Amino acid sequence: MRATVLGAGSWGTALASLLAGKGYTVTSWDKDAAVLDDIARNHRNERYLPGLQLPPTLHASGEVAKALEGAELVVLAVPSHAVRPVVIEAKRHVHAGTPIVCVAKGIELDTLMTMTEVIEDVLPVPLHPYLAVLSGPSFAKEVAKGLPTAVTVAARWERIAKQVQDAFHTKTFRPYTSGDVVGCEIGGCVKNVVAIAAGISDGMGFGANAMAALVTRGLAEITRLAVRKGANPLTLSGLAGLGDLVLTCSSDLSRNRTVGRGLAAGKTADAIQRELGQVAEGVRNARSARELAKRLGVEMPITEAIYRVLYEGLAPREAVTALMMRETKPEL
């Protein structure tokens, strides 16, 4: 099989390495020439996955047309804000019958579309049935190291979900299939916002009780938004919902949790992301998820609080107090 991964960041490189490790011929595309040169010459990506030796069947190209030539599987692994321009550039080179797997997690700010909605907005209608989403608790660094990981692959066509599942399945990477694309997308996007809240809680020393409450109530508001968008609520209790949320809220590998800890220490989100050298999707998603919730009439107090901390200058401690002092109500 020939596969193309659009995006050579940490996640794109980890998935490209996984596919190449199965013996597939894989081409990574990116706009960063230095990263591509490192992959092509040294079989490494020291910027995003330092210390990892990449398989010799992983190649690199800075030309979209060349990278997609003969591709039987396309993985879209760019940051959420880059999905539309990259798909616009790539659409002439993708053909019906080729599965397109989106691993970007976000809601487009201008349109409030999920990533697959953005892709469908750009691609010709005959390509829409071949879209899939891969999401779940999966840090790139651990996948690249071959540590056991389980994820969800969602597609509207069961045949496509199964095809993608088979392509990615290894002895250390186990995908489960689902037909709930929107549930997987909302879970994967909004958990990043809750993870910022988790980082704030941890950074301010609020303890385990607060963290448990935050994860539970965070899942509740993620589920409300997903269901309003047409998702099956059970999806949010699975890998793409609860699983991804727990991982991102609890691990020091989480960029979004790191942003929250930095905010608790008085840093700005911009300064924290410069230190990280990578995108923390929750910063952008806090704004778009809040706007989508307002449009759909969904109450999302944690998302609202993080938006105010990031964009209105609300002090993290005041945000916590505001959450705790909201009007009392039944849990369910």
UniProtKB/Swiss-Prot annotation:
Entry's EC annotation: 1.1.1.94
Enzyme class: oxidoreductase
List of catalytic residues: K191 (proton acceptor)
Domain of life, source organism: Bacteria
Coiled coil: none
GO MF annotation list: glycerol-3-phosphate dehydrogenase [NAD(P)+] activity; NAD binding
Position of the signal peptide: none
Pathway: Membrane lipid metabolism; glycerophospholipid metabolism
Pfam families named among the record's database cross-references: NAD_Gly3P_dh_C, NAD_Gly3P_dh_N
Keywords on record: Cytoplasm, Lipid biosynthesis, Lipid metabolism, NAD, NADP, Nucleotide-binding, Oxidoreductase, Phospholipid biosynthesis, Phospholipid metabolism
InterPro entries: 6-PGluconate_DH-like_C_sf, 6PGD_dom2, G3P_DH_NAD-dep, G3P_DH_NAD-dep_C, G3P_DH_NAD-dep_N, NAD(P)-bd_dom_sf
Keyword Lipid metabolism: yes
Binding site for sn-glycerol 3-phosphate: K105, G136, S138, K191, D244, S254, R255, N256
GO cellular component: cytosol
Keyword hit for Glycoprotein: no
HAMAP family linked: NAD_Glyc3P_dehydrog (MF_00394)
Function text: Catalyzes the reduction of the glycolytic intermediate dihydroxyacetone phosphate (DHAP) to sn-glycerol 3-phosphate (G3P), the key precursor for phospholipid synthesis.
Name recorded for this polypeptide: Glycerol-3-phosphate dehydrogenase [NAD(P)+]
Species this chain originates from: Anaeromyxobacter dehalogenans (strain 2CP-1 / ATCC BAA-258)
